[in-house]
UniProtKB/Swiss-Prot annotation:
This is ATP-dependent Clp protease ATP-binding subunit ClpX. One of its GO terms (molecular function) is ATP binding. Keywords: ATP-binding, Chaperone, Metal-binding, Nucleotide-binding, Zinc. GO terms for biological process: cell division; proteolysis involved in protein catabolic process. Signal peptide: none annotated. It comes from Brucella suis (strain ATCC 23445 / NCTC 10510). InterPro entries: AAA+_ATPase (IPR003593), ATP-dep_Clp_protease_ClpX (IPR050052), ATPase_AAA_core (IPR003959), Clp_ATPase_C (IPR019489), Clp_protease_ATP-bd_su_ClpX (IPR004487), ClpX_bact (IPR046425), P-loop_NTPase (IPR027417), Znf_CppX_C4 (IPR010603). ATP binds at P121, T122, G123, C124, G125, K126, T127, Y128. Pfam families: AAA_2 (PF07724), ClpB_D2-small (PF10431), zf-C4_ClpX (PF06689). Component of the ClpX-ClpP complex. Forms a hexameric ring that, in the presence of ATP, binds to fourteen ClpP subunits assembled into a disk-like structure with a central cavity, resembling the structure of eukaryotic proteasomes. It comes from the Bacteria.
Length: 424
């Protein structure tokens, strides 16, 4: 390439695009590299090629929607129990992304979106199910807490911030964000406070339900490119929420009494006794859930109508919690064993220890969510001491350790010396 001369018509000193061969006088801009030049027209052509490749790869991914059986199989690897809920979710998610894969094809029938409502007690796996689903489909996924949401204009988190978080999870790729999954937790906390009209505005209850209606049904949300507050001179990213799958979850405390009253199966007093004595009764009652029960609970009809797929989850009993501790691919016991393995120490749990941990979670009514905190409390002293101890090859946790009546058993490599097993 030659330099531009001061003289007017010397073609030897004119710069040319290294790709298309056009001179600097035939294009608007010529960008110089270390040894090459590229014009603005070639840059635009390259961008068009990249966009087409992105579209074609997206079409391929849409056609590769896993079957309900495949989704269920992966859920079984990570989530223990909840067979009915997993079947409902597998079919709903498969149909949703199958709908996206074929919506561009000519069809007289428009397939509506089916958002999902998960109803189940605390710690039964609602959030974990949604997270696992997003991992299976490989789409952007975010969690939002309904208790922090308020109507636009009030102190609190705006509903449109949900879309902003999803866009951030997709690295500001609008196309990917528009096919993502949003999980809204604690949705039962935005129920209408009472059936009676009030002179004060319910900005965190019914008002939030009204605000969520638009984005759940499908609207074009204007989101600031890098977050922050909106102002008139700012350019916005337009995100269409029509194809975003919304999954709402909540414990719905007290909903079982509404369902029981509708069925006239028990008296109010007897129903309360059953709830306190037999926790599994709650999960069984939830199986009889009807939309009218959600209306009585405090959800508005329009909001319930946006959640046509309802999956109910059961309480986790001791046996299920023991399975959760040991069987999934990322089970808690396996996680702590991996931590101890980094210190070249084998961590062993006796069967009675696992059942004692599960019993504590049932007593505390925290479900699977409380298992980690119980494990942390049991292993805290051991994890504190272990890095400074020499020769320990095995740590054994028994049921007495969980109950607090004994310390973990330390087995040393050279001498079969034991530290622990001493009354606390």
């Amino acid at each position: 390439m030659s330099k531009v001369s001061n003289g007017g018509g010397d073609s030897k000193n004119t710069l040319y695009c290294s790709f298309c061969g056009k001179s600097q006088h035939e294009v608007r801009k010529l960008i110089a590299g270390p040894t090459v030049f590229i014009c603005d027209e070639c840059v635009e052509l390259c961008m068009d090629i990249i966009r087409e490749e992105n579209k074609s790869s997206m079409v391929k991914s849409r056609e590769g929607v896993p079957t309900p059986q495949e989704i269920m199989a992966v859920l079984d690897d990570y989530v223990i129990g909840q067979k009915d809920a997993k079947r409902v979710l597998s079919v709903a998610v498969h149909n949703h992304y199958k709908r996206l894969a074929h919506q561009s094809k000519n069809s007289d029938i428009e397939l509506a979106k089916s958002n999902i409502l998960l109803v189940g007690p605390t710690g039964c796996g609602k959030t974990y199910l949604a997270q696992t689903l997003a991992r299976i489909i490989d789409v952007p996924f975010i969690m939002a807490d309904a208790t922090t949401l308020t109507e636009a204009g009030y102190v609190g988190e705006d509903v449109e911030n949900i879309i902003l978080k999803l866009l951030q999870a997709a690295d500001y790729n609008v196309e990917r964000a528009q096919r993502g999954i949003v999980y809204i937790d604690e949705v039962d906390k935005i129920s209408r406070k009472s059936d009676n009209p009030s002179i004060t505005r319910d900005v965190s209850g019914e008002g939030v339900q009204q605000a969520l209606l638009k984005i759940m049904e499908g609207t074009v949300a204007s989101v600031p490119p890098q977050g922050g507050r909106k102002h008139p001179q700012q350019e916005f990213l337009q995100v269409d929420t029509t194809n975003i799958l919304f999954i709402c979850g909540g414990a719905f405390a007290g909903l079982d009494r509404i369902i029981s009253a509708r069925g006239e199966k028990t008296s109010i007093g007897f129903g309360a006794t059953v709830k306190s004595v037999d926790e599994r009764r709650i999960g069984e009652v939830f199986k009889e859930l009807e939309p009218e029960d959600l209306l009585k609970f405090g959800l508005i009809p329009e909001f319930v109508g946006r959640l046509p797929v309802i999956a109910t989850l059961e309480d986790l009993d001791v046996d299920a919690l023991v399975q959760i501790l040991t069987e999934p691919k990322n089970a808690l016991v396996k996680q702590y064993q991996r931590l101890f393995d980094m210190e070249n120490v084998e961590l062993v749990f006796h069967d009675d220890a696992l059942r004692a941990i599960a019993n504590k979670a049932v007593e505390h009514k925290t479900g699977a969510r409380g298992l980690r905190s119980i494990m942390e409390k049991i292993l805290l002293d051991t994890m504190f001491e272990l890095p400074t101890l020499e020769g320990v090859r095995e740590v054994v946790i028994s049921g007495d350790v969980v109950d607090g009546s004994a310390r973990p058993l330390y087995i040393y490599a050279e001498r079969q010396d034991e530290k622990g097993n001493v009354s606390a």
